[in-house]
Every structure is written in structure tokens, then in C-alpha cells.
């Protein structure tokens, strides 16, 4: 089974930059996107053979997630059932026979870390949500999780030491998640692979210089880690400041 996750930084914009070509060529069983920046009805995109689910933010042109699945889920939920977290369209959960698929766009802590305190509350509540799912059946979490966990996961760790996405607090929360029974699929397969990133700033020719961060993930329940076949980062795909990531797994 092939799963794709991509922060598209605005679905309408990326539609003009080869999104559909990649979507069709990769032929994913499940394709998740983050940062759609759409309200309901603003775009009609329903590829043949896919069930489509959208979760939009109340605020226009902001956040938002979507899932395209060849397999019809048993159930779909939007958000994590906590009101303060559920107005930004950040989470969609699809329940399948053998697993849960959770598509997430984690809140950014922002410059000057103005949202770090909220981010910590989000992390604690979201982790509890995932742990509860994991008691029922295995979980596959994907999305832009807005954190590079270790120094190997970004080009310039020293200069970014206290910046959003690489604070001790955010990194610690990723450690807490993994310690709660989950596995970072990419690092599980490639513990020492360096220089592979999924996001680059639009400034300072960052992508050209590969001055990036690995902040887009497929994280699975530890109970199914042996079923992971590959975890890929499609650095060759443009159209957004992020590139797609892929999980191949036999479930």
C-alpha cells in the first residue's frame, strides 16, 4: 500500500504547478494534503477512483487538510474532539478495517515563539488522542508536524537552535510521542541518512542550496513497524515549499 503526504501551501496555487501530474503518476492508495487554504466549495477536485474528505479552517485562506483514498473508510472524523483545537481544520482521521490513518497539520509555534504555549497544549492533547486510537488498532500518522527532531534533520541546527520547529520544547514533544509507542518511519529505515529534507524556506535560495528541514513525516504504531517497506522523501517534486513524503507498507 502506497501513502503520500504533502503540504501543498495552497491547493489552488499548486494546481498550476504540476500537482495533478504528480497525483496521477504516483498513483497512491491514500493521498493526504495539508495547508489546503480552502473553504468548502472553493475548488472541485475529485479524482476518479477516490473518496475525498476535506477539513477547512474557519479562518479563510488558512490551514486546512484533505484526504483522497481509493479505499472507502469505515468512519471519518474531523478534528480531535477538543473545541479549542478544532476550528483550524488540522486533523482528519480515517478508520479502516486494520488501521487508523490520521492526517495532521501541526500548529506552527510562529516567529518569536508567540504560539509555543498553545503548541505545547496541542501536542499533549493530540498525543493522548493518538494513544487512545492506538489502543483499538494500529495508527498511521502523516503530515507536516512542524518539528525537526534531531540535528540530522535540518541543515543548520546551530543557528536555528531556538527557532520555531527546533526548540527544545517541540523536539521534546516529538520524543514524547515516539516514546508513547510510535515510530518515525524514515528514521526507522534510515537512521543515519543526512541531507534529506522536506521543507525549504522561500528565502535565501534555500532549496537551491538544500538548506532544508525534515518536518513532514509518516509515523506508525510501533506494533506495525516491521510491515514498513519504504519511507521516501520526493525532493524532486516542486510546486510548494514542501515536497511530498511517501510510506510503502504492507497491511
Predicted segment positions?
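Structured beta-strand-rich core segments of catalytic domains in phosphoester-bond hydrolases
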Residues: 37, 42-109
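Active-site-proximal beta-strand elements of phosphoester/diester hydrolases
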Residues: 1-9, 98-110, 142
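Active-site beta-strand/loop signature of hydrolases that rely on acidic residues for catalysis
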Residues: 7, 23-41, 101, 130-151, ...
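Conserved beta strand-loop-helix elements of the APE1-like EEP
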Residues: 60-76, 196, 203-226
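Metal-dependent phosphoesterases centered on the DNase I-like endonuclease/exonuclease/phosphatase
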Residues: 30, 51, 122-211, 215
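Active-site beta-strand termini and strand-to-loop segments that position acidic
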Residues: 70, 94-97, 221-222, 247-251
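Surface-exposed cleft-lining segments at the edges of enzyme active sites
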Residues: 81-82, 107-123, 158-162
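N-terminal, active-site-proximal structural segment of metallo-dependent hydrolase catalytic domains
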Residues: 1-47, 51, 57, 62-63, ...
Amino acid at each position: 500500500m502506497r501513502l503520500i503526504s504533502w503540504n501543498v501551501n495552497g491547493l489552488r496555487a499548486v494546481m498550476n504547478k504540476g500537482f495533478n501530474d504528480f497525483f496521477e503518476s504516483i498513483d497512491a492508495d491514500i493521498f493526504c494534503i495539508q495547508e489546503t487554504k480552502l473553504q468548502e466549495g472553493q475548488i472541485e477536485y475529485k479524482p476518479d477512483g477516490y473518496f475525498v474528505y476535506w477539513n477547512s479552517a474557519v479562518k479563510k485562506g488558512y490551514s486546512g487538510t484533505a484526504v483522497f483514498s481509493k479505499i472507502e473508510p469505515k468512519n471519518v472524523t474531523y478534528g480531535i474532539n477538543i473545541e479549542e483545537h478544532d476550528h483550524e481544520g488540522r486533523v482528519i482521521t480515517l478508520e479502516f478495517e486494520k488501521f487508523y490513518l490520521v492526517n495532521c497539520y501541526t500548529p506552527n509555534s510562529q516567529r518569536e515563539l508567540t504560539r509555543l504555549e498553545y503548541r505545547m497544549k496541542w501536542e499533549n492533547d493530540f498525543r493522548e488522542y493518538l494513544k487512545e486510537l492506538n489502543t483499538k488498532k494500529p495508527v498511521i500518522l502523516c503530515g507536516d508536524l512542524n518539528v525537526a527532531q534531531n540535528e540530522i534533520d535540518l541543515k543548520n541546527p546551530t543557528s536555528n537552535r531556538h527557532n520555531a520547529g527546533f526548540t527544545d520544547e517541540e523536539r521534546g514533544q516529538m520524543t514524547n510521542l515516539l516514546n508513547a509507542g510510535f515510530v518515525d518511519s524514515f528514521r526507522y529505515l534510515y537512521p543515519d541518512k543526512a541531507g534529506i529534507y522536506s521543507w525549504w524556506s522561500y528565502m535565501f535560495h534555500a532549496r537551491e542550496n538544500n538548506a532544508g528541514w525534515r518536518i513532514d513525516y509518516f509515523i506508525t504504531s510501533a506494533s506495525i513497524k516491521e510491515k514498513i517497506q519504504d519511507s521516501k522523501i520526493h525532493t524532486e517534486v516542486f510546486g510548494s515549499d514542501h515536497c511530498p513524503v511517501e510510506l510503502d507498507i504492507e497491511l
